[in-house]
Amino acid sequence: MSATHVFYKVEIDTKDSVQPIIYFRKAKRCSTAKGADRQHNRIVNETVDAWRQFSSQIMRYTVSRVPADVVVHGDIRTA
């Protein structure tokens, strides 16, 4: 599964919360570096659009690529 997919960790820091909101996105692996860069930008833009209604409460978005073993059957390991 990890050979055909990449995983993105999305962290959203809000003004009121001590802990960030964390979730993961899975996407098909790109064959080129330029494609991977475009895919990362797409994930960032989709995240910002999805959370736009809460933008006044959000301080920071962090989207990073993580290895497949960080997300195992819904469990979160340290990335």
Regions found by a protein language model. Name each.
Residues 1-3, 13, 31, 46, ...:
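Intrinsically disordered/low-complexity terminal segments and short unstructured peptides
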Residues 1-26:
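Short aromatic-glycine-(Arg/Gly/Cys) micro-motifs in beta-strand/loop hairpins
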Residues 4, 28, 34-37, 51, ...:
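Intrinsic disorder/low-complexity segments
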Residues 6-12, 30, 36, 40, ...:
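Hydrophobic beta-strand residues in large extracellular and virion-surface proteins
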Residues 17-46:
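Short, flexible N-terminal segments of the mature chain
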Residues 41, 45-79:
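Short, mixed-charge low-complexity intrinsically disordered segments
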